[in-house]
Amino acid sequence: TYAREQVSRFDALLARLAARGLKPPRVHAANSAGTMNVPGALYDWVRVGLVAYGLHPSRDEARLPLEPVMSFRSRLVQVRDLPAGAHVSYARQFTTKRPTRVGVVPVGYGHGYSWLLSNRGHMLVGGQRTPIMGRVTMDLTMVDVTDVPDVAVGDEVVLFGEQGGVSLPVEEVAQGSETLAYEILCTIGKRVTRLYVRQDHPVRVSTLIGERADWSAPVTDYLRRRDAKAEA
């Protein structure tokens, strides 16, 4: 294969360096796909990126048991009832066909959520897939929660991840965004709060702008999900 050809050329370079008395202290060449599929490319180190997130570099390599470690979550900030024939979001790109309950999610392209998901993506609310209504705006996205029982302001929203046994993979979000999962993971905005977990215990809460002073809300949310999963 082309990858093995490149490894052979790299080996030849290392041999030429060694012949001149030059030996790099560490040698590395393999990304996630190379680590999984090209044993000769492992050397001293490997540079796994996507695999470190528990994701596969391609569908053909799904034989390694990996579990996604990252999710993107928010909460409904508004729930409104609209009649049939009402327009939702900018430019009247969505019109309700029935009496519809709309959930407003405080995430938009300003947070790194792709505008291309307008009228085509989904989010999880109440363990159900809810379609995006109209355009994704800079700070808000609307979803159809008509069929979600007892939906209310404050309910959790999953933009990618798992909720109530239902999965919304980041790969699906990437496909709807006409890009790769790599880019989705890398383009989540700086102001989005990150909750870091080690061995089922929250260890840090921050944004990429700085440390977050108030840990309580994201930590409480995580502990609630962890305990519910353990009870199930």
Region locations from a protein language model:
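C-terminal accessory subdomain/extension
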Residues: D81-A232
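Active-site loop/helix belt of alpha/beta enzymes
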Residues: T1-R75, V79-P83, P149, V205, ...
